[in-house]
Amino acid sequence: MQLFFLCAALVIVLDQFTKQLAITHLMPNEESLVLIAEWLKLTYTENTGIAFGLSLGSPMILIVSTTLILAALFLYVVFSKNRNPGFLITFGLILGGGIGNGIDRILSGRVVDFIHVDIYQGYLFGSWVSLWPVFNIADSAITIGACVLVIWYNRFFTR
């Protein structure tokens, strides 16, 4: 069980620390800081919605629904008899990522994103597109946790 809490705490601390660095050193609407060629950059953005900037309407609906989902996830893990390390790490990643983005939403009404993997940028069907959204550490933790959960579902949930 300690692994679950440790993983969630590590994600929260790393997420909030890197977002603070982005707020301090990257400016909104300015040039990206190129790290590797033109495909890995740091680009400051603020997201008031969920993944890919999708909106659920009122910010309060997003905060309440996220809180309920995270509370259910927390209770599920705490009361589960499953102590598989992969299970605990996976759910720790998801919980930590959800709390990390939740902190931003509660404090400022938006989530800071800054990691920009630009796989493709150009015209697609007559419109200018950047194929991959800008994201943050919390988003990465949630995505990795969800992917591992899907791939290893049978390993985590077989008796």
Curated annotation (Swiss-Prot):
The active site is at D113, D139. GO terms for biological process: proteolysis. The keyword Transit peptide does not apply. Keywords: Aspartyl protease, Cell inner membrane, Cell membrane, Hydrolase, Membrane, Protease, Transmembrane, Transmembrane helix. It is an enzyme of class 3 (hydrolase). It is a multi-pass membrane protein. GO terms for cellular component: plasma membrane. The chain crosses the membrane at residues 59-79, 87-107, 131-151. It is found in: Cell inner membrane. Its EC number is 3.4.23.36. Pathway: Protein modification; lipoprotein biosynthesis (signal peptide cleavage). Its main location: membrane. It catalyses: Release of signal peptides from bacterial membrane prolipoproteins. Hydrolyzes -Xaa-Yaa-Zaa-|-(S,diacylglyceryl)Cys-, in which Xaa is hydrophobic (preferably Leu), and Yaa (Ala or Ser) and Zaa (Gly or Ala) have small, neutral side chains. This protein specifically catalyzes the removal of signal peptides from prolipoproteins. Belongs to the peptidase A8 family. This is Lipoprotein signal peptidase. It comes from Chlorobium phaeobacteroides (strain BS1). The gene is lspA.
